[in-house]
Amino acid sequence: MAKTTDVRPKITMACTECKERNYITKKNRRNDPDRLDLAKFCPRCGKKTTHRETR
């Protein structure tokens, strides 16, 4: 089982327009303590949209 204080936890990225969770990635908590916002392609919207980290 993963530690609760893992430095590189798995996070889920959700589209800000349609709210679909499309991507799973890892991030470094020490370098990026805030939520990530990345421009990614959303297959449901069919265009490049902002994806935000979900909890």
Swiss-Prot record:
Keywords: Ribonucleoprotein, Ribosomal protein. One of its GO terms (cellular component) is cytoplasm. GO terms for biological process: translation. InterPro entries: Ribosomal_bL33, Ribosomal_bL33_sf, Ribosomal_zn-bd. The lineage of its organism: Bacteria, Bacillati, Actinomycetota, Actinomycetes, Kineosporiales. The keyword rRNA-binding does not apply. This is Large ribosomal subunit protein bL33C. Belongs to the bacterial ribosomal protein bL33 family.
